[in-house]
Amino acid sequence: MLDTNYYDRLQIGLATADQIRAWSHGEVKKPETINYRTLKPERDGLFCEKIFGPTRDWECYCGKYKRVRFKGIICERCGVEVTRSNVRRERMGHIELVAPVTHIWYFKGVPSRLGYLLDIAPKDLEKVIYFAAYMITAVDDEARHRDLPSLEAKVQTERSRLEQRRDSELEARRVKLEEDMAQLEADGAKADVRRKVKDGAEKELKHIETRAQRQIDRLDAVWDRFKNLKVQDLEGDEILYREMKSRFGKYFEGSMGAEAVKRRLHDFDLKSESEKLREIIKTGRGQKKTRALKRLKVVQAFLDSGNSPEAMVLDCVPVIPPDLRPMVQLDGGRFATSDLNDLYRRVINRNNRLKRLVDLGAPEIIVNNEKRMLQEAVDSLFDNGRRGRPVSGPGNRPLKSLSDMLKGKQGRFRQNLLGKRVDYSGRSVIVVGPQLKMHECGLPKTMALELFKPFVMKRLADLEHAQNVKSAKRMVERQRPVVWDVLEEVIKEHPVLLNRAPTLHRLGIQAFEPQLIEGKAIQLHPLVCSAFNADFDGDQMAVHLPLSPEAQAEARVLMLSTNNILKPADGRPVALPSHEMIIGAYYLTMALDGLKGEGRAFTSLAEAIMAHDLGELEIGAKIKLRLKGIVPPHDETVRADGSVILDTTLGQALFNEVLPDDYPYVDFLVGKKQIGKIVNDLSERMTQLEVAHVLDNLKDIGYKWGSLSGVTVSIGDVQTPPTKPEILAGYETRAAKVDREYDRGAVTEEERRQDLIQIWTEATAELTAAMEANFTQTNPIHMMVDSGARGSMTQMRQIAAMRGLVADPKGDIIPRPIKSNFREGLTVLEYFISTHGGRKGQADTALRTADSGYLTRRLVDVSQDVIVRENDCGTTRGMPKTIAVDDGNGNLVRVEGLDTAVYARCLAADAVDANGNVVVEANSDLGDEEISRLIAAGISQIKVRSVLTCTAAQGCCARCYGRSLSTGHLVDVGEAVGIIAAQSIGEPGTQLTMRTFHTGGVAGDDITQGLPRVVELFEARSPKGKSPLAEAAGVIRIDESDNRRKLVLVRDDGEDDVEYVVPRRARLEFDLDGTHRVIRDGVRVAAGEQLMGGTADPQDVLRISGVRRVQEYLVKEVQKVYNTQGAGIHEKHIEIVIRQMLRRITVIESGDTQMMPGELVDRGAYEAANRKAVAEGGRPAEGRPVLMGITKASLATESWLSAASFQETTKVLTDAAINGKTDTLVGLKENVILGKLIPAGTGLEVYRNMRVEPTAEAKAAAFTMNYDPFDYDFGSGSGEAVPLDDLDLGDLG
């Protein structure tokens, strides 16, 4: 077998007939498959053992040779080679065709490659291939020119002869008529008899004349056609062609079907055609030039790749190995077979029939019909349904052809190559495991035994509990008691991977150390639920076992849950306490008045705990407490002995126990937000392992006090504010007043609607405030909402105050409010209007999931080959960013959105303060601390490095990318940052709303939002309701003549004025990015400025303002959508995708390079070609950047394997084959498809041959992971979990 890791490129091309025969192990001559009685393959049939190999290992067909000792012998009786049966998965056969057929991909694809090459319209080509017209394949011009005078003379002679014959026939008939008339007169016949005879004769005369004229016309037509006959002319008139052939057959050749096309391709001169087309491109213009460019692409492809154009016509068809198109017997004795077998049978049947007809010398028309049917059979084998009606099987289902085997989700690429089912895996329902440590998971014993079976068996044999592997296997299957002890030993230190579908981002698969548990459900640590998006309402998870030491090391170092605390999308902690844990922390840190023990002072925490245990002190009572070794929260004085006296509560002191000693004392109420901030601070200053330790403690204390708090929910906790009736009465009066004004005609329908919405929004707000004021601090529901454990004030309002205004399915707000709340119950009408809009929400969610998944797939595809390839590309370019603004009092305040714009990037240039001192050096990582330092030094503008300005030849460099958000330090070389970017953008996609919101029926206001807006931006589509942009700087003039409104831009540069026709309802007064703009007569605008309310088209921004502006515009617009949903995504992720969208350049003028005008070229290749041209003293090419949508950009990738596995498989493969494309395997997908290690992370050369050597301290500490300190007494370890810094992992850690 070929080792996939030892080749580095893969080429595709057109297979010639000789190559197909060379692959083949024999010709398939019969359509038979399996003998229904013996169930053995028929000889020379589609499953023949002689061709494809034996069906049983080491056994020939007739049974003469059995056993492995005859390996390699070919049986002289049946001709079958004695070998393994799995050769039936790789051995191919072939069908030798009696007549050639064209390959449907090259003829019927869009555009038709055959049509472009030969310059024939596809419908004309179809006529030739399917025997409806003849094609002239060769003309002997020289002989025709030489013999033309003599031939013309012959034709003239023939013509004269025809005329003479006509004249003599006419004369003879007239004489006969006269004789007949004379005879009738002599006989005294009646006048009408005479007239009848005369009429009959005249008819006959006319008939003679028309017949003769037809022969003369036919002769003229044949002669004219022959005189002007050119190669590749089509002739659909069979009679005319036959006559021409019989008269002038030696001067030309013509035929029908694929034979004609093959002959043409054989004689086709690619070089001269290429020169002719280049000449047309230089001199021609318009349609002619465009067509020449398209044709040159195909001609040049054949010249460059060395493919033979004749290979597009097949003389033999390959037959794929039988095990790839199996036939299996069902229970009832019937057979289930792959559709391919039926399609192959049709080809073989028609081929054999054609052979018989040719041998019999059947008439041409019958042979041609059979050839056409053979062509159709091969077409449907290659791509069923591409032309005409698809061949269907039982139940009218179209049969799956070879193309269908590759295409779509169930095709070979996506089903079997990019995703496979694996062994050493299992799945089960998950339940919560609150007792687990963060790096642990609970694995059911029976499941673990099955997963670790080989390890257990080996260990049983090593410990001599079993004599051999077979008896060890038996012991495992019978579950002997000793097996469980061995299992316990085997699983120690062996991580397993847990995965929850859908795996939307890298945190969907994490490694844990398994703990054996009883039962059948997997136990999951509560803090990792948010990363997996898991809950315990019946979710299932899959377990996978890393087998090799390398895989185990990667799982432990890179994937262990304690090393995945940060979210790759924004670099903030994802493993945060939630639900009961928040309630526990909230209850613990509450300080209430009037509790037992209030005002007392305690000398130590132990004393306070003792008082609490004796019932003298309540947990939330305000007390004075003396504590040692803490960081005071405010400016309390530290006494000489290092102690501080604090105003606090026992609960707060207990809460601070779980935090590190050097963390400032927490003396405030802790809810979800506060815990988030605490963990965020800790993750900035501590290692992930230490943070995991703190998180575990927070979880334990949260659960403990959550239980002790006794928080419950009852209907009595829902308290409707007593002032509700009078609050509503006041607003009802205002609403009635608006209605009266409307009835009088004082306000319009729209104004009334807006007023009512305004009134009832205010009413809801006031009632909500009254409700909040009505809750006591210890009200359980209020505690849940206020702490952030569950629910929100909006939900609370609907239960306790009033439901308020609701939207209808279109997204418009219904101006009638729902005054009841759920506690009181809704009226029938109120219930109806509230469900009306609610249903739309449900349907939306279902649609959103699919759309979001598809967006993620496209994003992954476009960015999959962006990998960090080098440490520093050395560029000095960067993106300017504002980090602070003046608040009006001379103080700098931090701007919004720094977390996603500047945080975790590298500085591009030294940040210097007003005195010229360097505050932060270039290439420094910008964390929260550095940003605060810059603002404190009075710096408001900095320049940061970005992937958009990175100059790395492939992928990007570590400095331009900055900090890896999931590890918290500079990104490693080899990190697949493109995939991380795609996951980070796609993962929150499902949360984004689908709807287009109407704020109140104002035209132009229904701007696309949510997921459709993100798709619109990434696909670079022209937006709905797009606004024109100023083509250049100048002054606007508004022209309202001709019954339409025009904006005329009078340009400053003196060029022609630009006119923009805008709708009458267009808003010329609008807000854009926080500034109010008014477009009126005489207003001055800058180039690229928006001229009316709406959305700018990114293509226009690129054309007018250039690449940098369109990059900024796209980043800003995508961020806008995610920010409205509160999903923080770092800008570097969006930048990676945008960089991929702007990777291509359209060549306008080729200069002295090999590139063709109109060709799409990769930016790097374009710049390299230009540098080469200039170095050789030539002219560089001219081009302009292109903004491609992500789908188009994915298909335009250099890798044909990656593009084919994405979309339009047949089209991509057709193009790649003609161009003889080579895939250099630099991206991830192509390597996954081929089963190679991916060129990212540990798959890079650097890490391939690396050995992991633990230090002495790490070896000692390694055994202390799961024990308490008193459990061991060896080594020099500290008893902490393995400190990863001590492991010498190269660049991995």
From Swiss-Prot:
Binding site for Zn(2+) 1: C60, C62, C75, C78
Any one GO BP annotation for this protein: DNA-templated transcription
SMART domains documented for this protein: RPOLA_N
EC number: 2.7.7.6
Domain of life: Bacteria
Keywords of this entry: DNA-directed RNA polymerase, Magnesium, Metal-binding, Nucleotidyltransferase, Transcription, Transferase, Zinc
Any one GO cellular component localisation term in the record: DNA-directed RNA polymerase complex
Cofactor annotation remark: Binds 1 Mg(2+) ion per subunit. Binds 2 Zn(2+) ions per subunit.
Binding site for Mg(2+): D535, D537, D539
Required cofactor(s): Mg(2+); Zn(2+)
Entry-linked Pfam families: RNA_pol_Rpb1_1 (PF04997), RNA_pol_Rpb1_2 (PF00623), RNA_pol_Rpb1_3 (PF04983), RNA_pol_Rpb1_4 (PF05000), RNA_pol_Rpb1_5 (PF04998)
Record field: catalytic activity: RNA(n) + a ribonucleoside 5'-triphosphate = RNA(n+1) + diphosphate
Amino-acid positions noted as binding Zn(2+) 2 in the UniProt annotation, renumbered to this chain: C873, C950, C957, C960
GO molecular function, one term: DNA binding
Record bears the keyword 4Fe-4S: no
Family membership noted in the UniProt record: Belongs to the RNA polymerase beta' chain family.
Physiological role: DNA-dependent RNA polymerase catalyzes the transcription of DNA into RNA using the four ribonucleoside triphosphates as substrates.
Subunit-structure text: The RNAP catalytic core consists of 2 alpha, 1 beta, 1 beta' and 1 omega subunit. When a sigma factor is associated with the core the holoenzyme is formed, which can initiate transcription.
HAMAP family per UniProt: RNApol_bact_RpoC
Name under which the protein is recorded: DNA-directed RNA polymerase subunit beta'
Species this chain originates from: Cutibacterium acnes (strain DSM 16379 / KPA171202) (Propionibacterium acnes)
Lineage, highest ranks first: Bacteria, Bacillati, Actinomycetota, Actinomycetes, Propionibacteriales
Gene: rpoC
